[in-house]
Amino acid sequence: VCTALNGSGGWPLTVIMTPEQQPFFVSTYLPRESSGGRMGLRELLLTVADKWRGSRAELTKTAGEITAWLRQKTAPAAEVELSALTKAAEAQLEESYDEEYGGFGTAPKFPSAHNLIFLMEYAQLKNEKKPRQMVENTLRQMYKGGIYDHIGGGFARYSTDREWLAPHFEKTLYDNALLALAYTEAWQDGHMALWRTVAEDTLDYCLRELKAPGGGFFCGQDADSGGDEGAYYLFTPDEVKQVLGDEGGHFCECYDITPEGNFHGKSIPNLLLNTRWAFLPEGYD
């Protein structure tokens, strides 16, 4: 909808619709408050509420026209076989697949759990090896990288590099819910203990950090902490040794925590180096 109306899309997506689910406003990210000549979400919602009360018929008419135009714009030119569509989708993902580090494309690189779930189900349906290999390598590389929180569990929004090392440190509920599902389905498919471990740790993170006291869940955690982006997730060897004592050295070697650091002078814990101290659950290769 956003791409069709505005020429481009993105996430988060802001769509305002009628009760009949017909859109009349669509945008990507909007700040909470208005600033720099850009309307914020709070002001927008108040403006739309006033407009809805005073000119509901006009908004409903506009929404209907947009919906009719979108249906015409997106109508298939001809009947297409479902098997042909799924094969085309698999081929497109295979074309953009990163053989070395998993995932799709270069950088920034998103987990794209929905693509992984599709490929797993496609592999099961068609009994093909390549889609399953793409999924397993991607799940493994994401777990090893800094996009995965090796201490608190859960995944960051995306990686700023191809190797999954340096994430944008925001954590979102929907990403982690979908990734927990992807790792769970991978465990059900191959019974590799690592997939179950990651799924459980991710769900534990959601229940511990994102569950609201009054019920429901928060949508995520901001990337900023301690005044800087990712400060909560960065460590020095001295900080680790203050907590772990003599075991701190082993931890630092395992998780690539060094004096020079790998991110602005500090270290993002990761298992990309495959050191001898690395904790690798049963079934990891």
Give residue spans per PLM region.
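Replace the tail clause
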Residues: V1-D285
